[in-house]
C-alpha cells in the first residue's frame, strides 16, 4: 500500500506557518517543525503582550499625573481623591494628556481638588 503524505492540506499548513515565521533567524524561518514552535511561542507572547500593554499604559498615565500633581503641590492619591470629591469624572488617560499638553488647565484641576480637600 502506498504512503499518504498529507497532500495539499499539509503544504498549505506548512506554508502558512513558514509565512508567519518570515524574518526569524536560521532554521526558525526555514524548517517547518522549528518554525511551528517559534510561531506558537510568538503568538502566545503577543497575546500576553496585548494584555500587558494596558497595564503599562495605566502605569505611564499615573506616573505623568503624579509628576504634574506634585509640581502643583499635591500627591497623586490626594489629587485623585480631591477630584472624586469634586465629582470630576476624567479618566487617567485624559488627565495624563492634560498634564503633558495643557499645564494651565491641569493646574486649575489641581486647585479644584485642593479646594475640596480643605
From Swiss-Prot:
InterPro entries, A to Z: Ribosomal_bL20, RIBOSOMAL_L20_CS, Ribosomal_protein_bL20_C
Gene Ontology MF annotations: rRNA binding; structural constituent of ribosome
Biological process (GO), any one: ribosomal large subunit assembly
Cellular component terms per the entry's GO annotation: ribonucleoprotein complex; ribosome
Keywords: Ribonucleoprotein, Ribosomal protein, RNA-binding, rRNA-binding
Domain of life where this protein originates: Bacteria
Record function comment: Binds directly to 23S ribosomal RNA and is necessary for the in vitro assembly process of the 50S ribosomal subunit. It is not involved in the protein synthesizing functions of that subunit.
Similarity-based family: Belongs to the bacterial ribosomal protein bL20 family.
Protein name, per record: Large ribosomal subunit protein bL20
Organism per entry: Agathobacter rectalis (strain ATCC 33656 / DSM 3377 / JCM 17463 / KCTC 5835 / VPI 0990) (Eubacterium rectale)
Gene behind this protein: rplT
Amino acid at each position: 500500500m502506498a504512503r499518504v503524505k498529507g497532500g495539499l492540506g499539509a503544504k498549505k499548513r506548512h506554508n502558512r506557518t513558514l509565512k508567519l515565521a518570515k524574518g526569524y533567524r536560521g532554521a526558525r524561518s526555514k524548517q517547518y517543525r522549528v518554525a511551528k514552535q517559534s510561531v506558537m511561542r510568538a503568538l502566545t507572547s503577543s497575546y500576553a503582550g496585548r494584555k500587558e500593554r494596558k497595564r503599562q499604559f495605566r502605569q505611564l498615565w499615573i506616573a505623568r499625573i503624579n509628576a504634574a500633581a506634585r509640581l502643583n503641590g499635591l500627591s497623586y492619591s490626594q489629587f485623585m481623591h480631591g477630584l472624586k470629591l469634586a465629582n470630576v469624572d476624567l479618566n487617567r488617560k485624559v488627565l495624563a494628556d492634560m498634564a503633558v499638553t495643557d499645564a494651565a488647565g491641569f493646574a486649575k484641576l489641581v486647585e479644584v481638588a485642593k479646594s475640596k480637600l480643605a
